[in-house]
UniProtKB/Swiss-Prot annotation:
GO terms for biological process: 'de novo' IMP biosynthetic process. Gene3D superfamilies: ATP-grasp fold, B domain, Phosphorylase Kinase, domain 1. Its EC number is 6.3.2.6. SUPFAM superfamilies: SAICAR synthase-like. It is an enzyme of class 6 (ligase). Keywords: ATP-binding, Ligase, Nucleotide-binding, Purine biosynthesis. InterPro entries: SAICAR_synt/ADE2_N, SAICAR_synthase_Vibrio-typ. The keyword Methyltransferase does not apply. NCBIfam families: PRK13960.1, purC_vibrio. Pathway: Purine metabolism; IMP biosynthesis via de novo pathway; 5-amino-1-(5-phospho-D-ribosyl)imidazole-4-carboxamide from 5-amino-1-(5-phospho-D-ribosyl)imidazole-4-carboxylate: step 1/2. This is Phosphoribosylaminoimidazole-succinocarboxamide synthase. The lineage of its organism: Bacteria, Pseudomonadati, Pseudomonadota, Gammaproteobacteria, Alteromonadales. Belongs to the SAICAR synthetase family.
Length: 367
């Protein structure tokens, strides 16, 4: 059996019982359960939610996306072996730590399989909640061009690339295209200031202006928990993206929670601390794959320029990367997951059949 067989690339075609279209994202697919199945699972498994809460199966794939495109390899390799299991394992670990330390809950109610979450429906805050501890990436590119204001924050003079910032900075961007907000362009992933959010908090889906401070508190506290834990294993938590939303608690009241994934190599930059101390940047995140792509293709502007999206999509569609590139990414993801969780990431021989078997036999969600 080849490594290509161990990859779950297509994750939106499982025969899970649902009466709504499957939502297929870049990496995860969401199957909304029927009202009857949601109620049954809540009762059978004593999930701490109102009995009428909509539930979903969230199934992660091994696909790898970068620069808003999905990339594939030669020899039929349609993803990265072990990537999905590594991402879920890392998120599960951090969500567990958050709960231990009295931070907010997540949307996850159950974990039937390393690739599967059972989640409750959440109403998302329309913000990519980005937290930065070092100046790198898009912030550095803007700074290098002479920009000194980033998301409404004034940056001091004399900063150097990849250096640690004096304070952790919150630099949010829009989640999706938001319309009709003065001063905010109608485009995806646009940087916004705290002032933008405060003036239009309802448009960003906050229940109240006070909840802006709550999301910032949960963001910085969550960042701190992960950063402290990574320091213990000689890793640096450089920057990250969190997502938040509202769910109903068991009494039917709204509560703000963490959602999607947290502190993973997909949503964060993680550097090797010993190498950083020696003046080297060694990525233990998807940023290493992004840098490889920028160096691999002769015209990196295609990957960075949003106005060349058609060319970028053609580049991803028409170019199969060497298998070794994807295997190196697999090693990065599985090794950092094992360091963080202390548990080995085991590759399934047939992940799709495993998931079907669990959801059919233990949860009766497949006829």
């Amino acid at each position: 059996m080849s490594f290509a067989d161990k990859v779950l690339a297509v994750n939106d075609n499982l025969p899970i019982r649902t009466d709504l279209p499957v939502h297929s994202g870049k990496v995860r697919s969401v199957y909304w359960l029927t009202e009857q199945d949601s109620r049954r699972l809540i009762e059978e498994h004593n999930y701490p939610v109102p009995k009428d809460t909509p539930l979903a199966i969230m199934l992660i794939s091994d696909r790898i996306s970068a620069f808003d495109c999905i990339w594939r390899g030669e020899e039929g390799m349609q993803g990265v072996p072990g990537k999905g299991a590594a991402l879920n394992a890392i998120s599960n670990h951090w969500f567990g730590l958050f709960k231990e330390q009295g931070l907010a809950d997540s949307h996850i109610l159950d974990i039937p399989h390393p690739l599967v979450w059972i989640v409750q429906k959440a109403r998302p805050i329309m913000i990519e909640a980005i937290c930065r501890q070092y100046i790198t990436g898009s912030m550095w590119r803007a700074y290098e061009k002479g920009e000194r204001e980033f998301c409404g924050i004034r940056l001091e003079e004399g900063l150097s690339r990849d250096s640690k910032l004096a304070n952790i900075l919150i630099t949010p961007s829009t989640k999706g295209v938001l319309k009709g907000i003065e001063g905010v362009p109608e485009a995806d992933d646009v940087n916004v200031s705290r002032s933008d959010i405060a003036q239009h908090y309802a448009a960003f889906n906050f229940n109240s202006a006070d909840d802006i401070a709550l999301y910032e508190k949960l963001l910085t506290e969550g960042f701190g928990v992960i950063s402290h834990a990574l320091n213990k294993i000689d890793q640096i938590f450089v920057d990250t993206k969190f997502e938040f939303g509202y769910v109903k608690d068991v009494d039917g009241n709204d509560k703000l929670i963490y959602m999607d994934e947290v502190g993973t190599p997909d949503s964060s930059r993680i550097w090797d601390a010993k190498q950083y101390d020696q003046g080297n940047i060694v990525e233990n995140s998807k940023e290493g794959f992004r840098q490889l792509l920028l160096n691999y293709f002769p015209d990196p502007d295609i990957l960075l320029n949003k106005e060349r999206m058609d060319e970028r999509e053609a580049l991803a569609r028409n170019n199969a990367l060497p298998v070794q590139v994807l295997m190196d990414i697999s090693k990065t993801y599985t090794q950092i997951a094992e360091k963080i969780t202390g548990q080995k990431i085991v590759l399934s021989d047939n992940p799709k059949e495993e998931v079907i078997s669990v959801l059919r036999d233990r949860y009766q969600l497949i006829d």
